Amino acid sequence: MTPRPVILRRLTTGNGPRVLLLHGMADSVSIWDKPIALAPHRKALHQAEFFAAELPWRGTGPADWGYRAEPSAWLAEALDTLAAAEGPADVVVGHSFSAMLLLDLLCGPAAPDLRGIVLISPYFRARPEDFDWATMTGLPEKFVLAMEEGIRLAAGARAKPVLHRAMAERLCEFIGPYGWSRFFESYLRTPWLRTENLTAPALVVSGTGDRIAATAEAAALAERLSTATLRTVEDAGHFPMAEQPERFADLLDEFLQRPAPVRGPAGKPPHPTSLERI
């Protein structure tokens, strides 16, 4: 049986904002277990109603998800599923690949109306010149490193580092050329995202030890967004919500309690060209 592309999971109940969590490439909803376990001890998190989406690029998802040319459409489907079942999301939290796709969706013409967004370990480059050949040739190794890091965190005390590399390479094979092509395409067009269209309050979170999506990219994104705040997490890499769950829970709790900020000036994307949508 072919797995369903998008599956919605309720994580908590509450009478506060409805929050949708979106995992990254080859991950699962379990990446949110640690911060969600801390929710009862924080006012805003305790009141919030948390949902998580199992997305097609999860480790057990359908192998053909990459055949769809616009992967951000899968996030729109997750938002529509939540809206139909429980009501529209107030806040959406995206990690890694999903953070990049969420940004793409919200900068587009059919952006959902949200009260806030949280972008964790996002991929973003402000100018097309920021990409070079070394960027492209180095990304495959970064993909494997990301998979290794995720496997290590998921395994915990049961970790067998000698197996992690082989497992990570197998995951990369499972995602396949079309899946990774969707990543490349989304990443390469980040300089042209219409970030001025994004008016919701935004929290950008980056681990200072992230070897995969560097903090400099998160900082560039926060500078581009007029309503964004950048928060870095010490002693964390690409998965700050799992590596430093207490710190991440504090940041999310603080964000959910903040009033909507007044918009200020923000950076602008390059002038549009015929390559705006690659």
Task: Kindly give the residue locations of the regions a language model identified.
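Conserved HGGG/HGGXW glycine-rich cap/lid loop of the alpha/beta-hydrolase fold
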Residues: 6-62
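Flexible "cap/lid" loop of the alpha/beta hydrolase fold
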Residues: 103-145
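Conserved serine/cysteine hydrolase catalytic core
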Residues: 184-223, 232
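Active-site loop/oxyanion-hole signature of alpha/beta-hydrolase fold enzymes
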Residues: 4, 49-91, 250
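Conserved alpha/beta-hydrolase catalytic His-Asp/Glu region
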Residues: 128-130, 144-197
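Short beta-strand immediately N-terminal to the catalytic nucleophile in serine-hydrolase-like folds
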Residues: 92-94, 120
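Gly/Ala-rich beta-loop-alpha elbow adjacent to hydrolase catalytic centers
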Residues: 94-102
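Catalytic histidine-centered segment of alpha/beta-hydrolase-like enzymes
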Residues: 236-249
